[in-house]
């Protein structure tokens, strides 16, 4: 692959991970990300089974482990905070309810970016506006006005992929909703979490708190059933209103956690969904 010019759309997890392997094989890689910088926040990512081997082969085992949440375990509670069930991180050889290697999405993104930033070109605050491909390459027009030519273009821009819509068609054709919405955001650690995750469930909904590497803060977690997201995934204010509506009347610490919703720096909400496609490439354009 020496000398092949590859454009990757998306600088979260999949994009920088792909860039790592492409660069190792000699490709010239550019990653474009519409956000002005790496996006913080998001859920915890558990590395299990083959994922541990992939991390090792990338030479990132030490970096990933250093950024782990160091969660000791989890327990479920009733409305009064009484413990119902306890799960330890070392259960089942470290692959139980809490994985031995557990890292926040934003921290994993930072590890992958730091690993590739010196050998990969990153363009933040821009996006692919138009592309035209022929037998020899792909001409790309960026929203910022730049025009460049690449040998391959790969979409790693997630559930709401703009590249997928541009090349394959509208998202409604491919996205299958699985009936659940998740939300995450950091809050001040005023709950004495120490190293334990707490989970409370009520009427098909859940609320929880988990420790994060910054011991002064904690991660709030919510889930609720929904046939669709119901709001624009880019409209954060509407997403926060939706979360408040769906969590209304829920017991335990839920009202207290929701008081921090407006001042959190890293709110994230999205539906749980699956992308189903007959093919993942079209000429010189592919998707992860």
Name each model-derived stretch.
Residues 5, 28, 217:
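Residues at the starts of beta-strands that form the adenosine-phosphate
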Residues 1-6, 23-25, 48-184, 227-244, ...:
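Conserved N-terminal helical subregion
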Residues 10-12, 34:
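Glycine-rich Rossmann-fold phosphate-binding loop(s) that bind the pyrophosphate
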